[in-house]
Amino acid sequence: MAKKLLGLALLAACASAAHAADLKVAIDPTYEPFTYKTADGTPTGFDVDIANAVCNEIKRKCVFVEQVWDSMIPGLQARKYDVIVSSLSITDERKRVIDFSDRYYKTPSAIVVKKGTEYTGPASLKGKRIGVLKGSTQEKWAMGELKPAGVTIVPYEAQDQVYLDINAGRLDGTVADKVEVHGGFLRKPEGKDHGYVGPDQYDEKYYGEGIGIGMRKGQKELKEQINQAIKTIRSNGTYDTIAKKYFDFDPYGN
């Protein structure tokens, strides 16, 4: 009987250890090519592959948790998951409430409207309706730079909903990550009549230092492990292999 109880205790301990090895990773699967789903519902994309590479380095298993973008940080604080790997910009505002890893990519944002739209500055879009992802840095930029010029800013729970409403004529355009809007809209048939206007947007006042992995404050050991993992995959070729699946340039940035 004692041996049986000991065996059960060991099994429970092993199960507990296996559970502890899982790293719950929040993603918004509506953000192609960074986080989206295959036809069978499997999470995929640049962010997903980076998360799996990091998990491999720190010897933990990634378990992906789908989350609406605007609830990402509240969900992290509520311990619904351990980290956010979903194109989360490292900004001063966010650093006040959560911690970040070192950056793992940095790409510009851009305005997308119908081709032929004359643009010399925000005032050129006066009277137009521009859709943005709710809670995003692009929303911050649009509210700070476009709204004062008379542009109506319409926040959405998911970026793919923005594209649907552009095609339906309910929106005139969007402000989005330049790579995401290319992969998720412009390169598709429904985006063929639209294009970029204005300069690429890098303003750190809105967009911060690049994209990092978000985690709760005080997780010093996890942060150190993840930062080392990012350094390792950058140096051993894993990062480049992942990047080449999705891009024809180095998304790490300058």
Place the predicted regions along the sequence by residue.
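Sec/Tat signal peptide C-region and signal peptidase I cleavage site
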Residues: 1, 14-22
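Bacterial N-terminal signal peptides that target proteins for export
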Residues: 1-7
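Bacterial N-terminal signal peptides
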Residues: 7-15
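Proline/Glycine/Serine-rich low-complexity intrinsically disordered segments
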Residues: 21-254
